[in-house]
Amino acid sequence: MTDADRARRIFGLETEYGVQHWNPEGRPLSPEEVVRYLFRPVVEWGRSSNVFVANGSRLYLDVGSHPEYATAECSTLDELIASDGAGDLLLHDLVVQAEERMAADGVGGRIHLYRNNADSSGSSYGSHENYLLRRRTEYRRLTEALVPFLVSRQILVGAGRVVPAGTWPEGEGPAHFAFSQRADFVQDGVSSSTTRSRPIINTRDEPHADASEYRRLHVIVGDTNLSEHTHLLRFGATDLLLRMIEAGFPLGDRVVAHPTRAVRQISHDLTGTARIALREGEASALELQEHYLERARAFVAAEGAHHDRVGEILTLWGEVLDAVRTGDRSRIEDRIDWAIKLRLLEDYRARHDLGWDAPRLAQLDLAFHDIDPDRGLFRLLLRRGAVARLLPEDAARSAVETAPPTTRARVRADFVARARERGLDYAVDWTTLKLTDHPLHAIVTKDPFDTSSAAVDRLFGRIA
């Protein structure tokens, strides 16, 4: 690893998609039946429902028949956002193929895939962030310092949710709009489980890299985002917090006494002023985030910006906090997910004189997350220019076939392409590349910053 690599970080994002079949003329298919249609082309070419695709990312079926896409390793936020967008395009292409096969089988209706975190039956599915850390960082100190930030971060980057009546975390209450989709399903602060307890941070130590040098921070409290700017703020602000912790930059003692209670309290208070208990005293989400922003600005002033989007991240961070504090969301309604959705629903409520308990609002909430470019409400707003873009319009489409050029994903994608060109069976995972007929020549790629591999060249040269 070079000095330049030490200034970078590997990022990754895992997205689980909600599945629904709508059939007005017959029985709707179960999620299990839908994903069998959806993944049939994947199984045909990959011989499995768990594959690595052309851009180095992973596509597979998760628990509960949820399609999941895990981005390739990325070392810039632009790479991450583009790679994540490529997942939506890949899955939408599978939807189109699945509906054609269904029609040929005499099955009507449409398949919907949603980038959201909760369904009407009370199930939740996640959006998991991955950050590569240096092994020397004291993990207990890092997680203790990070939890208050993550608990309150939802006022910046929550996806927004229409909460039905009677589902307040601390008792009964009317239907209302909340910051987060995921908050009410969080059951623990820090845990090694991702499904049984749904913690804020998962502690399972699987670095997918040299374990003597790295570990992976796995954050699972976040909502699935749609806006590129919200992605930028989510990962950019968290990266800044991690850099401050790693550098020993003073953040103050702000330990949340009851993280799961706090994350729910904050989600249901759009003013950002609800008081949550700390180990010493109390604070609001606004106060916590204002403190972290002030610390981040001081850190950047002292150490310099480590990439060219840092200034943009700090500015947007401040703008969102101003919007929460004042209630004037006009400056962020084209970039921040919860504010984009809230404006859409508030406008609809006003036109039709509806309360938050109106079934139509719950339907619009769901449709907001549909990845179909012609049916998803967020996609329609984006196409009309009501939502701002961060990257060029073709960035995600380009990332469907192209791996991030700055990481090990490039090696993996090249290996897969060369094997398929030659009609060779292969098996790959995050760190291992293997041709089935040459099992003794498996290649291990432990450095996530490697962008080329002499071992891969030698292997294919040997069998040319």
UniProtKB/Swiss-Prot annotation:
Residues reported in the UniProt entry to bind Mg(2+): 14, 60, 68
Entry-linked InterPro entries: Pup_ligase, Pup_ligase/deamidase
Residues reported to bind ATP: 58, 71, 430
GO BP, sorted A to Z: modification-dependent protein catabolic process; proteasomal protein catabolic process; protein pupylation
Membrane-crossing residue ranges in chain numbering: none
Pfam families: Pup_ligase
Reactions that this protein is recorded to catalyse: ATP + [prokaryotic ubiquitin-like protein]-L-glutamate + [protein]-L-lysine = ADP + phosphate + N(6)-([prokaryotic ubiquitin-like protein]-gamma-L-glutamyl)-[protein]-L-lysine
Active site: 62 (proton acceptor)
Pathway annotation from the record: Protein degradation; proteasomal Pup-dependent pathway; Protein modification; protein pupylation
Keyword terms: ATP-binding, Ligase, Magnesium, Metal-binding, Nucleotide-binding, Ubl conjugation pathway
EC code: 6.3.1.19
Any one GO molecular function term: ligase activity, forming carbon-nitrogen bonds
Role this protein plays: Catalyzes the covalent attachment of the prokaryotic ubiquitin-like protein modifier Pup to the proteasomal substrate proteins, thereby targeting them for proteasomal degradation. This tagging system is termed pupylation. The ligation reaction involves the side-chain carboxylate of the C-terminal glutamate of Pup and the side-chain amino group of a substrate lysine.
Note: The reaction mechanism probably proceeds via the activation of Pup by phosphorylation of its C-terminal glutamate, which is then subject to nucleophilic attack by the substrate lysine, resulting in an isopeptide bond and the release of phosphate as a good leaving group.
Recorded family membership: Belongs to the Pup ligase/Pup deamidase family. Pup-conjugating enzyme subfamily.
Name used for this protein in its record: Pup--protein ligase
Organism: Micrococcus luteus (strain ATCC 4698 / DSM 20030 / JCM 1464 / CCM 169 / CCUG 5858 / IAM 1056 / NBRC 3333 / NCIMB 9278 / NCTC 2665 / VKM Ac-2230) (Micrococcus lysodeikticus)
High-level lineage: Bacteria, Bacillati, Actinomycetota, Actinomycetes, Micrococcales
